[in-house]
């Protein structure tokens, strides 16, 4: 069994050793829930990594969006280069669920675009969980959505060992049942080809390696891993396990049984709708379901097959669907990062999905069983989750209730950096005062973050500062991901001095060059000026040894009082630690991972090409598809050097797209 092994120049420091020991003690004492209160810059990811290494347990890390998940994935991959660090998020680049609007009698068909790179990574994640124990899966909250049954997924594998006999026709038929496509010309992921005594398989979890099965009659002589572009043999394998090209692969008997049960439910539904005098709905559900049944009979699948998933997994009505949590070993460990955001997201997912599907069922577009194709209810997730460590600088009531109010604090930063000094100034004439503060901050070589309450105010302030010849940009929800990364890069490199926004709490906005955070209208109680929001915003200045925060307020609110009190408490703890050990706070430059990926692309493409390429996701996808075709064409023409260059460029773009998704 492989053990987790951290490869790093750093050792736990500050509060980290104590926090690691306390969390591990709680895990050993069978505590189901623990709270790691980690502030900005305290090394939460490195602390999690050390807990994983010492407990040596398979781990799932949940984040509340793809961007944060990608950031944690990149960091964990660099910390654990010898172990399986996997990425599991929604594989849709674009997703429009089917829906019906009764008021206007409009039915919207499901429309989606699947990201092949992320689909590959999802397969790699489930394969790792089934084959090894040194696994870390970093996931968004989409991991609570239905996935194929792990029992069926593993049952449908094809296990191969040299020296054993495998009737070739049966093997080819098994590959088709695993939803692999025979393609003797265009060999790509999810395909197989037959050449003489060789069967080449391109596994669903690889992008640059395939397997060559060499037969003598029905006897499997060798299994070689090879480069599908150049044909170069890389290594001889002792065995190979081929997993399905979809998480929803099913044996023929399961499909036939499901067809029978779907027909039975259809007849019950028709009888019910007729009893309600809903003739249009009766005709609609009969026509749509009969078409799906014909497709299932002929091909084993149909459009929207996931709506019949309950019949394929053998679950009863109302039972939770199989999810990634069922792939986890019983002794797995769960970290919920930024839990104050992630937990409410999990709680909200079921209700939104249910409301949309109930309308479809009511109006005859779907059978009632479609309601069981859903994310987990919050109570189900709470029941399924293994031993859990919630991680947040601002824990919410749920986490505190789960841990009985106990928290493990990660406050002392190894860098010695203090929480920023907080100053309250009158909101009257706040803009005039801000201009003076901006001038003095920029003079020191630092940049400024300004947060407002409304989009209109942010736009007006940006225009005003630009008129005063300050290099100012505006961050808002309409800014595409790549453009957002470019703005942050410009801010860090000094091309921009001031960034104005409404909600500057988004992850990845940790900027060591930030010398001032200005919070306008700080006394306007609400979501953007709550205690949690204020603490998170104040934290944006915590990576600079000279960082300051100015709160413009005409009155002291409870949120301001609590936020400043908590900030001062943390500042005092760090100060005492620094004095005791003679630590001098020092600003540490930190590379933004997505930024690094963007710079990788910039090094291979000129700036204009990069900007045009990433202007929108459709352009990026089209360019990646074009490069892939060029790569395959070069390989088929035996131009292997050119094909390898294109493959490297393609891989760089796909990694960048993943970071920027």
Curated annotation (Swiss-Prot):
Domain of life, source organism:
Bacteria
- Per UniProt, ATP binds at 38-45
Q: Which UniProt keywords apply?
A: ATP-binding, Cytoplasm, DNA damage, DNA excision, DNA repair, Excision nuclease, Helicase, Hydrolase, Nucleotide-binding, SOS response
Q: Which GO terms describe its cellular component?
A: cytoplasm; excinuclease repair complex
In this chain the Helicase ATP-binding domain maps to 25-182
GO MF, one term, reads:
ATP binding
- Where is this protein found? Cytoplasm
Q: Does the keyword Cytoplasm apply?
A: yes
Domain (Helicase C-terminal): residue spans on this chain: 430-592
* Any single GO BP term: nucleotide-excision repair
Disulfide bond found in the keyword field? no
Q: Residue numbers of motif Beta-hairpin?
A: 91-114
Q: Which InterPro entries match?
A: Helicase/UvrB_N, Helicase_ATP-bd, Helicase_C-like, P-loop_NTPase, UVR_dom, UVR_dom_sf, UvrB, UvrB_inter
Against Pfam families, the record matches this protein to: Helicase_C (PF00271), ResIII (PF04851), UVR (PF02151), UvrB (PF12344), UvrB_inter (PF17757)
- Show which residues constitute the signal peptide: none
Q: Which residues form the UVR domain?
A: 621-656
The family classification in the record reads:
Belongs to the UvrB family.
Q: Sorted alphabetically, which PANTHER family does this protein's record hold?
A: UVRABC SYSTEM PROTEIN B
Q: What is known of its domains?
A: The beta-hairpin motif is involved in DNA binding.
What does the record give as the function of this protein? The UvrABC repair system catalyzes the recognition and processing of DNA lesions. A damage recognition complex composed of 2 UvrA and 2 UvrB subunits scans DNA for abnormalities. Upon binding of the UvrA(2)B(2) complex to a putative damaged site, the DNA wraps around one UvrB monomer. DNA wrap is dependent on ATP binding by UvrB and probably causes local melting of the DNA helix, facilitating insertion of UvrB beta-hairpin between the DNA strands. Then UvrB probes one DNA strand for the presence of a lesion.
Subunit structure of this entry? Forms a heterotetramer with UvrA during the search for lesions. Interacts with UvrC in an incision complex.
Protein name from the UniProt record: UvrABC system protein B
Species, as recorded? Rickettsia bellii (strain OSU 85-389)
Q: Which gene does this sequence derive from?
A: uvrB
